[in-house]
Regions:
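N-terminal beta-strand motif that seeds the catalytic metal site of vicinal oxygen chelate
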Residues: 1-28, 34, 41, 95-100, ...
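A short, acidic/glycine-rich surface segment
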Residues: 3, 48-51, 81-86, 155-162, ...
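Core segments of cupin and vicinal oxygen chelate
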Residues: 9, 20-70, 126-131, 137, ...
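Vicinal oxygen chelate
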Residues: 13-22, 59-79, 84-112, 134-139, ...
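Extended intrinsically disordered, low-complexity coil regions enriched in Ser, Thr, Gly, Ala
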Residues: 29-34, 38-45, 90-94, 104-117, ...
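Short, structured interface segments
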Residues: 74-76, 136-163
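Short, basic/aromatic recognition patches
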Residues: 119-127
Length: 282
């Protein structure tokens, strides 16, 4: 996989997200039935030039799903990589979640209760110093982490004001993708070099954050990184306590190799300082 220089790979907007699965029909049903994603067109073969860009041989197929204005594509490759690591937690440096904004956390939680939880004790309301949101983390059948996010009354960001869920959906769309990083300051500088602007940093800690992450003594720096287009955005999670463990380098056909797809000048792949994979499309 290639890494482009900042001049070649300015990240101007998030075009979508790609999840890797070992069972495309099963994962499609989960996102449809649990979260109300809608199928976006027919299943398609992944183009040969994209497979080459990903460093993969053989063939692959893709199903695009939509929630609000955001698109998530589910990829399954003939030659599958590693399953999602069983021993990881929210601080692990391969951790990456999609944050789904909901209007009614109670109804959303009832819908996903059968999924594998990350959080303990159900949805958590974080203190005002951590944004004051209601949040709940869980996993899809392949192990990909997800977060339900409900903004408090009067504090919904402008991008989400006036948004309502379509019939049968619990989600309004995807607010961000969050990635765990070893050094939030270094990652901040790295992503700024690709055109992203940091937002207000918070230090999330306390019992609510501990229950949300199912980790003891949590202290995590949260840094939103905004593309010029606005939402959705990237979020950096720099865990001070506990320190996140690194895993083997991700390959594009590993189930944990979630890719944020960005609009850019030309097709390329980018690995960040911790090995998270980004795909750039022109």
């Amino acid at each position: 996989m290639s890494t482009e220089s900042p001049a070649d790979a300015q990240l101007t907007a998030i075009a979508g997200f790609h999840l890797v699965t070992a069972d495309l029909p099963r994962l499609r049903r989960f996102y449809q039935d649990m979260l109300g994603f809608a199928v976006e067109g027919p299943e398609q073969a992944i183009a040969r030039d994209e497979l080459e860009l990903l460093g993969l041989h053989g063939a692959g197929r893709r199903q695009a799903l939509r929630l609000g204005e955001q698109v998530v594509a589910i990829d399954q490759f003939d030659t599958m990589g590693r399953s999602y690591p069983e021993h990881g937690d929210a601080a692990s440096l391969w951790f990456q979640h999609l944050a789904v904004v909901v209007a009614d956390m109670g109804e959303a939680y009832r819908r996903v209760m059968v999924a594998t939880p990350i959080s303990e004790g159900g949805p958590q309301q974080l203190p005002a110093s951590s944004g004051g949101v209601h949040a709940f983390k869980f996993r899809d059948p392949d192990g990909h982490p997800l977060e339900l996010l409900q903004f408090s009354e009067g504090s919904r960001p402008p991008a989400w004001q006036g948004k309502t869920a379509a019939a049968g959906q619990i989600g309004l769309g995807i607010d961000h993708s969050a990635i765990s990083v070893a050094d939030a300051d270094a990652s901040n500088v790295f992503y700024q070099s690709f055109g992203l602007e940091p937002g207000d940093r918070t230090l999330n800690q306390g019992p609510e954050q501990q229950r949300l992450d199912h980790l003891g003594g949590v202290e995590v720096s949260v840094v939103p990184m905004q593309p010029v287009s606005g939402k959705p955005h990237l979020e950096l999670l720099g865990y001070r306590v506990p320190r996140g463990a690194a895993g083997p380098p991700l390959q594009a056909n590993d189930v944990a190799a979630t890719r944020i797809v960005w609009q850019g000048a030309r097709a390329a792949l980018l690995r960040d300082l911790d090995g998270h994979i980004h795909q750039i499309v022109s």
